Amino acid sequence: MNTEVIAIIPARFASSRFPGKPLADMLGKSMIQRVHERIVGVVPRAVVATDDERIRQAVEDFGGEVVMTSPECSSGTERCREAFDKVGRGEKIVLNLQGDEPFIQKEQIDLLISAFDKPETDIATLAEVFSSDVSFERLNNPNSPKIVLDHGGYALYFSRSVIPYLRGVQPDSWCRRHTYYKHIGIYAFRPTVLRKITSLPQSTAEQAESLEQLRWLEYGYRIRVLQTQQSTIGIDTPEDMEKAIAYLRSQGME
């Protein structure tokens, strides 16, 4: 276990697509508890960062560490930075684990941390290849941001749209003709860079796509992207939750 890593799980109650999502029941446990259980034991500390008393109480009830943050935070990364400033103990790597990724796996977290074996890595995240038989409807889902990578494995752009556009090819064939990457919402930062990027003003692309990582790219920061072979189920809507619960039952994880 890497003792120089802290995981912070930003969680807010007021989601426009799924209000109260962190406390939604997943077969007897809240979603935030299932996310917390995924990270405990993988890194030395896991801290939930929230601005809501209901979430704070729920985390304390299951024995987790929690810190209250400002309701003015405009993104999960800003909440992560505030939490680290309050409770950090000099860790060298800060993980920002989204509170709607209850199926994140140990191997994925270890992979992300391994990015910092290279001293030039300041920010890292994960991507999964869309399989060749994925329908265009699923590829085109704006809740599953796509990444375009350079030859060195760094992000060129993130988009809710399908990029690149394949001219002259039927959309249902796109995944058979090109490799598309799905972004998995977990980040890792060096603390100095985390503080810098959260002090920057919002960028135009970030505002257009509502993807905070575009701010970092627009201001010249490089994001290293590691490819994972494991799939996850991110939960953005009540319909996603129904699929997640069905998956829990199918895996005997009740």
Curated annotation (Swiss-Prot):
It catalyses: 3-deoxy-alpha-D-manno-oct-2-ulosonate + CTP = CMP-3-deoxy-beta-D-manno-octulosonate + diphosphate. The keyword Kinase does not apply. GO terms for molecular function: 3-deoxy-manno-octulosonate cytidylyltransferase activity. Pathway: Nucleotide-sugar biosynthesis; CMP-3-deoxy-D-manno-octulosonate biosynthesis; CMP-3-deoxy-D-manno-octulosonate from 3-deoxy-D-manno-octulosonate and CTP: step 1/1; Bacterial outer membrane biogenesis; lipopolysaccharide biosynthesis. Disulfide bonds: none annotated. GO terms for cellular component: cytosol. It holds the Pfam family CTP_transf_3. GO terms for biological process: CMP-keto-3-deoxy-D-manno-octulosonic acid biosynthetic process; lipopolysaccharide biosynthetic process. It is found in: Cytoplasm. Keywords: Cytoplasm, Lipopolysaccharide biosynthesis, Nucleotidyltransferase, Transferase. InterPro entries: Cytidylyl_trans, KdsB, Nucleotide-diphossugar_trans. It comes from the Bacteria. Its EC number is 2.7.7.38. Belongs to the KdsB family. Activates KDO (a required 8-carbon sugar) for incorporation into bacterial lipopolysaccharide in Gram-negative bacteria. This is 3-deoxy-manno-octulosonate cytidylyltransferase. It comes from Porphyromonas gingivalis (strain ATCC BAA-308 / W83).
